Amino acid sequence: MTEELSLENDVMYTTAEAAPVIFSQNSGVERGKFRSLTLINWNGFFARTFDLDELVTTLSGGNGAGKSTTMAGFVTALIPDLTLLHFRNTTEAGATSGSRDKGLHGKLRPGVCYAALDTINSRHQRIIVGVRLQQVAGRDKKVDLKTFSIQGVELSVNPTALFTETLNERQARVLTLNELKDKVEQSGAQFKQYHSITDYHGMMFDLGIIPKRLRSSSDRSKFYKLIEASLYGGISSAITRSLRDYLLPENLGVKKAFQDMESALRENRMTLEAIKVTQADRDLFKHLITESTNYVAADYMRNANERRGNIESALNFRQEWYKAKSEQDLSQHRLVDLSREAAELAENEKTLEVDHQSALDHLNLVLNALRHQEKISRYQENVGELTERLEEQKMVVETANEQLEESQAQFEQTEQEVDNLRSQLADYQQALDAQQTRALQYQQAIQALEKAKTLCGLADLAVKNVDVYHEEFEAQAEVLTDKVLELEQKMSISEAAKTQFDKAYQLVCKIVGDVPRSAAWESAKELLREYPTQKLQAQQTPQLRAKLHELEQRLNQQQSAVRLLNDFNQRANLSLETADELEEFYGEQEALIEDLSAELSDLVVQRSTFRQKRENLTALYEENARKAPAWLTAQAALERLQDQSGEQFADSQGVMNFMQAQLVKEREFTMERDQLELQRQQLDEQISRLSQPDGSEDARLNVLAERFGGVLLSELYDDVPIEDAPYFSALYGPARHAIVVRDLNAVKEQLANLEDCPEDLYLIEGDPAAFDDSVLSAQELELGVVVQVSDRELRYSKFPEIPLFGRAAREKHLEELQAKREEVAEHYAQRAFDVQKCQRLHEHFSQFVGLHLALAFQDNPEQVMARTNQQRNEIERELNQFLTGEQQIRIRLDDAKERMQLLNKLIPQLPLLADDSLTDRIEECREQLDLAEQDELFIRQYGVTLSQLEPIANTLQSDPENYEHLKADYEQAIQLQKQVQQKVFALADVVQRKAHFNYAESVQTETSELNEQLRARLEQMQQQRETQREQLRQVQAQYAQYNQVLIQLQSSFNSKNQMLQELMQEIGELGVRADEGAEERAKIRRDELYQQLSTNRQCRSYIEKQLTLIESEAENLTRRIRKAERDYKTQRELVTAAKMSWCVVLRLSRNSDVEKRLNRRELAYLSADELRSMSDKALGALRTAVADNEYLRDALRLSEDSRKPENKVRFFIAVYQHLRERIRQDILKTDDPIDAIEQMEIELSRLTEELTGREQKLAISSESVANIMRKTIQREQNRIRMLNQGLQNIAFGQVKSVRLVVNIRDTHAMLLDALSGNQSDYQDLFTDNRMTFSEAIAKLYQRLNPHIDVGQRTAQTIGEELLDYRNYLDLEVEVYRGADGWLRAESGALSTGEAIGTGMSILLMVVQSWEEESRRIRGKDIVPCRLLFLDEAARLDAKSISTLFELCERLDMQLLIAAPENISPEKGTTYKLVRKISGNHEHVHVVGLRGFGTTE
């Protein structure tokens, strides 16, 4: 703060100094000079040194002689900036900027080139500065530049000899830069190479080679533009447009005062921002340490968990390996047992398959037999039915045949009679007259009589006895008819007997085959005698079959029981055979099952008890596992509190007591802090009063002094030495703050209008420029001063112990006050820190109480978990023992139950096992069944036949052999009957014609009557014939129908009988009995065998599956064993490798004291995925956090290798080390970054409060700014006037004088008026803490000048420009030219020579101004070299050149001119340059002249 105010004082008091004359010489100090220019390996100059004249050096020569190249070398050595160098007369026209070589590439030759300036400064030091140039290969024609300087070289050493090495008398080699360095250092001189142009120019400024320190590229640009303007002559628009930047010096005092004020405010605000940034950094560091801890600790705990998990996995793999081996052994034993059992089942299955196939074939045969039997029964029924129908039909046919024959006979007789009648009628009709008819009738009667005689064999037959004979024959016919009827009856009876006999005979033959008719009765009698027995046997067949089935079932059960017994003995490894042994063993097994069940129940109860205990312990373990992370977090928080507080807490009450003590301690520290704050404020007020630039303790005095046009007395005595300060302080007494004015009377008039002024205002009349203490009559005493105020008033003032009169006294007292303030501030900071620390500690304790107090003092959950886990493991071992015992008991119990099941199956079948006669009974029953089935088959085949035979069997006793004789008698009787009837008919005809015998006399009269009778008889007989014909036809049809039915029945009978015989033959060939239960028995047998086969197959399939499963399990077990072994070995290798890495991690963490940070036990309860997620999230945050820190970034990148977890620990150590290095040990008294972050937070909070208060004190008023700007502008206006006085005598051609015109811009004048006027309109800008003063003044400028477009510039940039007084001024150059008077200096209004002269004058003013500006920052014994250029001097006439020479002599300035050959100045040194070409070699021949005199 003191430095800022002192700088401001310097600024404000420069106005009181007289501005020096621009062309005044520096008395006592010689100006530095350029001695020579050396060009090495330039185009035309292999090694040439041009000695420079102290005034003017002229380069004379024709076009292309090398004048511009020489000047280019000089400029390049002076300003080696490729961005600025631009030699226009050699630049390729129309070339693009990318390929343009700026005219330098073509001036060089291939290889190493040099351009060096040999100078001697005001200290008589020889300095060689230069640049090494080298063409860069490529189409862009680039040039590489390296700057260097050489000091300590003797004056006798030629610069050319430094840069070359002489090979022989005519040859030399250019040295490289390294060779040059070695050569210079070997000679004892100092060689230095520069890596930046700024360093190069800084050296040149410090040693007095250039007039201004070129700090930036803009400074170099100004210098180059000045050189360029000098080189090409004329008025440079680039310079005249920005003449303020060249001529008006930066008011370093004012600017520095504003900058210091701004920088102080900015620094203060930046400090506040930095505090915020630091707080953000603190948050970042906190974030960094938190994320680093999360990143590394999560990986650390994950690796620890994985290591523990890997070890457990290795043990599990080994256990799995051993377990798989034991399972393989058991599997192999089981495989052998099951293979043996599978072989037995396979053999048994083959037997069962054969039996089942036999049963299936038997079932098929039975089914076929049953189907055949059904067909036989059906056919037997059909045949029996057909036989009956056939017999009936035969009788019907015979009856129909007899009717047919009788009808035929009647029809034939009627037909014969009709024929007779027709013949008679024909005969009668032939005789148309009666005689003829009578004669005919008579003749016919005679014929009939003759016929009757013939037929009857009666010779004596006559008309008279014809009746007798007729009656006799009728009686005979009746006798024959009776006989025929009798015979017919006998025939019927005989025919029936014959039919029954035949039928019975056929039935017997059907049963027993062909037998003689005589033996039929015996066969029938034997069949009928055995028929009831066979029928009874057939009826007993189902019972016998059921009995046989039952016996076979018992046999099967006996066989099953035998197999079951054998199986039982095999399984039980016993040899029990008798029922007593089995029952005894049964009792033993029952007792064993009861004992094992009771023992198993006890084990189950105990196991349940242990499981309940295990569940309780598991619940307790899980509860503590859930509680453990929070408890560990609480313990970590408790440890942090104990570390922060230095106390040990045994219970929660101790924590509460400590919090209460902290509150009391905080109140004490707060009271001390407030007292120190009060002391600091008092010291700040004193320092603020003493820090006023003019020594006034009241700012109103400055306003009044400016208003009255006076100067503060303290300002006039500001330079009083400190030893005189007590005297002058006592001399003026209360008037030490008086205002010195030129005229008291003028001031008196203004006193009445004063509103704001101190209570006591002292005014002293005098000249502020020549004021002394003669105005007072005083006498100095030992301890004070007596002042005669008036004739009647004396004032005695003691010498003050702490004088404040004068800047030196104030500064001394300020130093004391500031030291005291710093001490108070340090104590205040310490107390504030303590208060903050107490508050933070109390806050931490409050957080701990709210979050962790309930858990922190409970038992360690991990210890409880360890005890619980131990108990749980013991219970697990006991449970495993119980499970093993229970498994053994269950196996024994299952075996016993299985034996009991087998015994339960065996015991009911004990009687079967003891039944030895079962097989014999089955054989006996089977024989009876065979007989019964044979009888049943016989009855089934012939039962119907026998039942038909039984009622007619007696007919077989007598064979009806007389049937043929009776039939012959019957036929004979029929024949006799027919003959007798013929005779009767013949006699009847005679009897009927008896009357015709009388026609002998009356034939004529009776012919017609006879004819009618014959006709009626004929008609009657015809009708009878037709009736008989119809009856015959019907009888024939009926007979044919009956005969057809008979034929059909006979055909059906024959086919069905044949089929029946075939079926009986086939069923006989099948060889099975087709009884009612045969199918059921076959099916039951088949189903039983199928069930046994299915059971056997299921058992075999199950066993084969078990074998396949065991084989696959064996393969799986083999793979499992290999895998378990491989996994175990891999896991063991992994554990071994992880152990090595883990040992490295532990060693690093323990040696670096970070194990406690990394071993966060609460993370051990998170899963690997959660820890990996936590680590990955932290890694992502860390990548952002360390992005700007290369070391940490590389460490973090290395730590990402998961194969090397130790790199993460190294990264954590690097973070800790990095944060430790960032700890300021002067502020923070700790090495722990986490504690440092806490202390930093407290310290930053305190600094924020302090700096916020300081910002309010640093603010400067707008009125003060306006006053400072006005004073500075007034001073610079005076300096410009002094410059104009030095330019009045400069004349070039018609230009008689040159001057500078400076004016204040209207817009800026309005700004100054606003700053010093009413502040109510813009006070909001300067009271806004968010804006700097520069931004506030920029905003005010924009308000006052809204029409001005500020473009894209920020308010800060505009404000900084407004704090530079040069921006308030407009500066122009005017020339007085002939009759035109004062004109603005422009190239178009002046001739070439006038423009060059005017421009050169302006440049001289600029150089002089620069030297004056830099005088304060350059050594006092250094006056810089002063040299300008002028190319193409032919544009100046001889008078102008002489004027330039005179100007150079007056200003002690060197000038380098390039002129054509026709110009030869009389003064200075002239070099004639001639470019010569000899063969392929080109060089410039140089001849040096001083004036027109001798050649050097």
Swiss-Prot record:
Molecular function per GO: ATP binding; DNA binding
Where is this protein primarily located?
cytoplasm
Which ranges form a coiled coil?
A: 332-496, 537-608, 665-692, 806-832, 862-1066, 1101-1139, 1235-1290
Q: Sorted alphabetically, which SUPFAM superfamilies does this protein's record hold?
A: P-loop containing nucleoside triphosphate hydrolases
Compartmental location: Cytoplasm, Nucleoid
Flexible hinge: annotated segments:
693-810
Q: Name one GO cellular component term.
A: cytoplasm
GO annotation (BP), single? DNA replication
Query: Could you tell me the keywords of this UniProt record?
Result: ATP-binding, Cell cycle, Cell division, Chromosome partition, Coiled coil, Cytoplasm, DNA condensation, DNA-binding, Nucleotide-binding
- Nucleotide-binding among the record's keywords? yes
Binding sites annotated in the UniProt record for ATP? 61-68
User: What InterPro entries does the database record attribute to this sequence?
Assistant: MukB (IPR012090), MukB/SMC (IPR050308), MukB_hinge (IPR032520), MukB_hinge_sf (IPR042501), MukB_N_dom (IPR007406), P-loop_NTPase (IPR027417)
Q: Which family does it belong to?
A: Belongs to the SMC family. MukB subfamily.
Its annotated function is as follows: Plays a central role in chromosome condensation, segregation and cell cycle progression. Functions as a homodimer, which is essential for chromosome partition. Involved in negative DNA supercoiling in vivo, and by this means organize and compact chromosomes. May achieve or facilitate chromosome segregation by condensation DNA from both sides of a centrally located replisome during cell division.
Classification via PANTHER family:
CHROMOSOME PARTITION PROTEIN MUKB (PTHR42963), DUF4476 DOMAIN-CONTAINING PROTEIN (PTHR42963:SF1)
State the domain notes.
Answer: The hinge domain, which separates the large intramolecular coiled coil regions, allows the homodimerization, forming a V-shaped homodimer.
Q: How does it assemble?
A: Homodimerization via its hinge domain. Binds to DNA via its C-terminal region. Interacts, and probably forms a ternary complex, with MukE and MukF via its C-terminal region. The complex formation is stimulated by calcium or magnesium. Interacts with tubulin-related protein FtsZ.
NCBIfam families under this entry? PRK04863.1
Q: What HAMAP family does the entry give? A: MukB
Q: What is this protein called?
A: Chromosome partition protein MukB
The source organism is Aggregatibacter actinomycetemcomitans
